[in-house]
Curated annotation (Swiss-Prot):
GO terms for cellular component: cytoplasm. The gene is hisG. This is ATP phosphoribosyltransferase. It is found in: Cytoplasm. It comes from Desulfitobacterium hafniense (strain Y51). Its EC number is 2.4.2.17. It is an enzyme of class 2 (transferase).
Length: 223
């Protein structure tokens, strides 16, 4: 393929629409790209590019190993997968928060500053899709926990005795409330990021930088 040809990895699911909208607004015509299609690879001849549709958790791997030159991925996934890629730009959409939550009847006491006292949670079990993020957070608090990795229904774990607490991503907090869970500590905020393969970023720097700058201008972000 030509040196300036780009393979762009986009995530299935709720981030796909926003990702396609951003690319369209900077002049990359991708009207044919649809998650409803059985296709996973969409050639974009005019743009000298192709889009591949991947599971969100796989995008850092596709980019790290060069199967994609660039990708759109949530910061939550980027932190958990911990792949060797270049993070180029915060795209701003797909906002969510990482939090620690517990059943409302088991929340720890509050400290004088209003925060919950986490010290009694040392060596407790944490149900999560993000064991790396959970361990890193509690390590920063000088604590160790036992992460239990689940792929769904995280909120169920404390109710059935699988774990004492959960680490999960939330947007509105509705699911926590419905399951009688209380947020006891914020961990971090996450949005969608533009990432690049390290070799592609050197070999196709002009093309990738041009796309990055167009997205930056679209978002109104300073360099």
């Amino acid at each position: 393929m030509a040196r300036n040809f780009l393979t762009i990895a986009l995530p299935k699911g709720k981030l796909l629409t926003d990702s396609l909208e951003a690319l369209t607004k900077i002049g990359i015509e991708c009207q044919e790209v649809s998650e409803e299609s059985r296709k996973l690879v969409f050639p974009l001849e005019k743009a000298q590019a192709q889009i591949i549709i991947c599971r969100p958790t796989d995008i850092p791997t596709f980019v790290e190993y060069g199967a994609a030159d660039i990708g759109f991925v949530g910061k939550d996934t980027l932190l958990e997968e911990n792949k060797d890629v270049v993070e180029l730009l915060d795209l701003g959409f797909g906002y969510c928060r990482f939090v620690v939550a517990m059943p409302e009847e088991k929340v720890p006491p509050r400290l004088p500053d209003g925060r919950f006292d986490l010290s009694g949670l040392n060596h407790q079990r944490v149900a999560t899709k993000f064991p790396r993020v959970a361990e890193d957070f509690f390590r920063e608090q000088g604590m160790q926990v036992l992460p239990i990795k689940l792929h769904g229904n995280i909120e169920l774990a404390p109710r059935v005795g699988l774990a004492e607490m959960i680490v999960d991503i939330v947007s509105t907090g509705t699911t926590l409330r419905q399951n009688k869970l209380v947020e006891i500590a914020p961990i971090l905020e996450a949005t969608t990021r533009l990432i690049a393969n390290r070799v592609a970023y050197r070999m196709k720097h002009e093309r990738i930088n041009e796309l990055t700058e167009k997205l930056r201008q679209l978002l109104g972000k300073a360099p």
